Amino acid sequence: MSTSKELIIYTDGASRGNPGPGGYGVILQWGGRSKELSAGYRRTTNNRMELMAVIAALEALNREGLNITIYSDSQYVVKAVSEGWLRKWIMTGFAGGKKNKDLWMRYHQLAQKQKVKFVWVRGHADNPMNNRCDVLATTAADGRNLQVDEGFENNGEV
């Protein structure tokens, strides 16, 4: 990455059925450069893919202490972080059967190393980066050699 500590991330997740095959798409932008990421899974949910997009973006970083703005069309992800839902879920041990604990804990670990701010964007609207992430996510969901979403399939989460 460049010497700039500013990073912009666009994310999207998709599933063909809920549950069904799914995928995520990510665009990272820094210092006039960009990188795209995507992956597909054979059985998952849209919320898991929305969150997995954020995790994949953060896992791709090789520096800590970055100022990151993440643009997402997922109110589930944006509100969980911005409105304190995640903090409450962690404090209560995800009581009441809150879903996606495995992914939320991965996100939480990664976010501790960065300065992350979320911005909600309307999906399938006039944001070209969100639209590109949607193409990446749906193409990945429709692809071959889909990965196993271990936290979903192996834990019987629905």
What is the meaning of each model-derived region?
Residues S2-M52, L58-L66, V135, T139, ...:
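RNase H-like nuclease fold core
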Residues T11-P21, I55-R132, L136, A141, ...:
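RNase H catalytic domain
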